[in-house]
Amino acid sequence: ALDANWHINPEDYKQPNGGVIFPNPNAPTGVEESLEMIEEILQANPDVVVIVDEAYVDFGGKSALPLLKKYENLLVVQTFSKSRAMAGMRIGFCIGNEKLIHYLNDVKFSFNSYTMNLPSQVMGVEAVKDDTYFKATTTKIIATRERVKKELTSMGFTFPDSKANFIFASHKEVPAEELFRALREADIYVRHWNKPRISNSLRISVGTDEEMDR
């Protein structure tokens, strides 16, 4: 369970288990866990694989990649679906100890029903080559996100510090469901979940400056 500030509790990961996986930054909160916290979880789980899902790390988060040299049971997974806007291509990758990667290669075709086709492979390679565009795009999204945070604060919203391409916000006075309906009527689409603890929050994706100014 997440604590009052939307952080994971490392004690939850110190129980007997068959493996550990968690997102960093988190979705839908955008909250980032420190490398110290991740290392604490790794130290408590030396005999199982610990997977850190970094789908949103390119929007200002700190990657756990530096910890790979110390922990052979760590796997870091990332995707092209978010920061590179290539969700339809089904491109992702995993970085870890050579032995773990070997085991993954041995079994990947037995459970992966979304293997990449040739166009996806070609586009993925070209996307990696265009580092200038990638950095410019993520830098712009981060700048827009930080500006929108200030605007939302002035409008009475509260939210955890997001390191993703969205903001998980709630208003001090207006219920989230009421805001969700009003925004939808204005053709502005945000995410709302009618679930315990998050029912009074909206996940607001960061778009262009023009879109956010609406």
Where do the language-model regions lie?
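Short, acidic/turn-prone active-site loops that include or flank metal/cofactor-
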Residues: 1-7, 56, 79-81, 195-196
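Active-site phosphate-binding strand-loop segment of PLP-dependent enzymes
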Residues: 4-58
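Short acidic/glycine-enriched loop/turn segments that link adjacent beta-strands
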Residues: 7, 88, 163, 197-200
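PLP-dependent enzyme catalytic core of the Aspartate aminotransferase-like
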Residues: 36, 182-186, 191, 195-214
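PLP-dependent aminotransferase class I/II
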Residues: 73-153, 157-160
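Short beta-strand-to-loop capping motifs
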Residues: 96, 169-173, 206-208
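Conserved PLP-binding catalytic core of the aspartate aminotransferase-like
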Residues: 141-142, 151-186, 202
